[in-house]
Each structure stands twice: as structure tokens, then as C-alpha cells.
Amino acid sequence: MSSTQQFLVIGGLVLLSLLALNFYRASDIQYNMKYENEATITATSIAQSTFEEMSTKAFDEVTTDWKTDSQDSLTLTASFGPDSAETTRTLFDDIDDYHGYYFVDSTMNLGKFNVSIIINYVVPSNPNTISSTRTFTKKATIFINNSYLKNQLQYIYAYSY
């Protein structure tokens, strides 16, 4: 085999190697995107079901048994979180019991989803603004992490009384 033929064979092998590398790189990117998309859909499902669960609870501890017209009677932000008798999520009776709540959902096929919840009073006309005083609008923010997600996902829902 002449040196020209050897160069052509080597050049062909190099091109074939580059083609194979690009194929595997593209396949890897596709798989990563597939798993990230599936994890995003699963996280959204977890957040949605948690928001729906929260919507079945009373707006505030004082509204579990009666109505109120006074914002001053609502729970102080510093007192958000479960009461001492509310040791599990099934015992929560109002929205702010979920404040600071953390749980791991591993029922799906992509491993563990770490979920944490923060509750704040917000300005009713602008739910993106946290209120320093008690209002008749609370914002629930759910943060979800998973090993297939590049970034922590954040879901927000506002509840009004």
C-alpha cells in the first residue's frame, strides 16, 4: 500500500471517529434533556398536588372554626409552622402549618425529590411583594430539587381569604 493510500485510510478513520464521537455526544445530550424534562414534569406534579392539598385547609388557625374580619386576629408570621399537636402533614389544619415543612418524595422513578415549603403574607394587589404585616393573602412557595434537575425549581401559589 502506498503512502497516499495510507493517508486516505488514516483520514477516513479519523473522520469515522469524529462522526462516532458526535453521535454519542448528541445521544448523551438527548438523554440528559429527556431525564431533566421528565424530572420537571414530576416536580410540577408534586407541587400541584401539594398546592391542592393546602387549598383544602383553612386559611389561618383563627379561621378553622369561625370567620374573621380583622387582619390583626390572623397568625403572626413568627408563629407560622405546625402547632405542637400537628406532628404529621395529615394533621395540618391551616395553610401556614406548611411553613418550613420539608419532605422527600421518592414515589416516582427518578429517585428522590426534596421538597420544602415557605409561607408568607403578601400584598394582596401585588403577590410578589412580601408584606411586613398580616394580610388576607398568603403566598406558598415550594422549592424542589432532584439529581436530574440542573437547578432548583420554584413554584408559587397565592391563597386569599
What is the predicted function of each stretch?
Residues 3-48:
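Aliphatic-rich helix starts adjacent to a transmembrane/signal segment
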Residues 41-161:
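Low-complexity, Gly/Pro-rich coil/beta segments used as flexible assembly/activation regions
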